[in-house]
Amino acid sequence: MELRSTQTPDILPSYWYNIVPDLPEPLPPMIHPSGEPVKRSELEVLFPRSLVDQEISTQSRIPIPEAVRETLLMLGRPTPLIRARRLEEALKTNARIFFKYEGVLPTGSHKINTAVAQAYYNAVESVERVSTETGAGQWGSALSLAGNIYGLKVRVFMVRASYLQKPYRRILMEAYGAEVYPSPSTKTNTGRKLLAENPDHPGSLGIAISEAIEDVVLSGGRAKYSLGSVLNHVLLHQSVIGLEAIKQLELLGVERVDYVIGCVGGGSNFAGLSYPFIGYNYNNGEPPVFIAVEPETVPSMTRGEYRYDYGDTAGLTPLLKMYTLGHDYIPPPIYAGGLRYHGVAPSLSILVKNNIVKPVAYPQDEVLEAGLVFARTQGILPAPESSHAVKAVIDVALKYRGASEKPTILFNLSGHGLLDLSAYTRNH
């Protein structure tokens, strides 16, 4: 069997897959604190009309504009599907391990898939600037590049712990022309209040979201909000990952997949790979085991409550029904900054609640060790976020050491760790 899939342009789909109509129960609406559903006009304060259309859509297939598709091709899609043969040999497992490698894209992760789409729709509607949050900086880097491509100004509020840990991501964002501020910042009322309480506040994604939204609301209509995870329109943009993988597996002669694995912060990279496999009844009615991996220190799915909660710390967003640790939860400053979010995408929450997706949590030291094992066998150092998926893959694969079964494991290597080297240096 070949170790690497084809990457011809026809592998990139012409549509996005929207899981909402295929969920096992209706998706609860976003609501106000009053309990009333959020109106479309209120969403349009934050997002361009086309993205609101996608957010509330019940169509399973949404066409990708040709301009977006051309940009994705230019930036390196489709991404490779690779067999991790050396990892298999090191683990002495009978399992076959494949990974979709999103780290080949210019900003080093899957985030560019939705950044391009969001920047395109904002540009079409003559938006002047987009404001956003970023954890480890992958999303901020992606939106900075996409904004530059489509002529948008970009303002990024970067979680302070990551701003200090990962200076090269800030440099990359600024190289693409973005303004980058450590969050909490002095640019917003939310940030100033938190800094007054604690000048050394490490920040969180929830706080950075609050700052970005406040910035948009006070912009006088010149700016829109852009986000890298959680909401439906973001997750459906990422479905290109799984749609490509299905085609590539077929071309490699792989007839079934037994495990689909990805890390989870808000849920976009996990959804991007897994949702097409869930919605398309892959394996003819014998679905794979879907494993969603989170940090032990941010156990939204494994220890959180399924209830309505704000998507941000200050309570500026509508309430979303999701697994949550509480919008005021401040995670410790772990290296996987992209996973430091208190909640989980509402659609993924439904899948966890209905036992379609199995959540697991791991401690940071075991995760980083798994990342080093992958680097030493496959030559790619994963981002700390992606190493969570690698840890789960290794645990599953070891169950099949000496076994008669030969399952196929597929996981999303959502990004490389070349701008996260301090995580591995300090751990080892």
Swiss-Prot record:
Per the record, the domain of life is Archaea
The annotated pathway is:
Amino-acid biosynthesis; L-tryptophan biosynthesis; L-tryptophan from chorismate: step 5/5
GO cellular component labels: cytoplasm
Write down the SUPFAM superfamilies for this protein, in alphabetical order: Tryptophan synthase beta subunit-like PLP-dependent enzymes
Give each disulfide bond as a residue pair: none
What does the record give as cofactor?
Answer: pyridoxal 5'-phosphate
Which PROSITE patterns would you find in this protein's record?
TRP_SYNTHASE_BETA (PS00168)
What this protein catalyses is: (1S,2R)-1-C-(indol-3-yl)glycerol 3-phosphate + L-serine = D-glyceraldehyde 3-phosphate + L-tryptophan + H2O
Q: Which InterPro entries match?
A: Trp_synth_b-like, Trp_synth_b_CS, Trp_synth_beta, Trp_synth_beta/beta-like, TrpB-like_PALP, TrpB-like_PALP_sf
Quaternary form? Tetramer of two alpha and two beta chains.
Q: What are the record keywords, sorted?
A: Amino-acid biosynthesis, Aromatic amino acid biosynthesis, Lyase, Pyridoxal phosphate, Tryptophan biosynthesis
Function summary = The beta subunit is responsible for the synthesis of L-tryptophan from indole and L-serine.
- This protein's gene is called trpB
Quote the EC number. Answer: 4.2.1.20
- Give the family from UniProt: Belongs to the TrpB family.
> GO molecular function terms here?
L-serine hydro-lyase (adding indole, L-tryptophan-forming) activity; pyridoxal phosphate binding; tryptophan synthase activity
Q: What is the official name of this protein in its record?
A: Tryptophan synthase beta chain
Q: Which residues carry this modification: N6-(pyridoxal phosphate)lysine?
A: K111
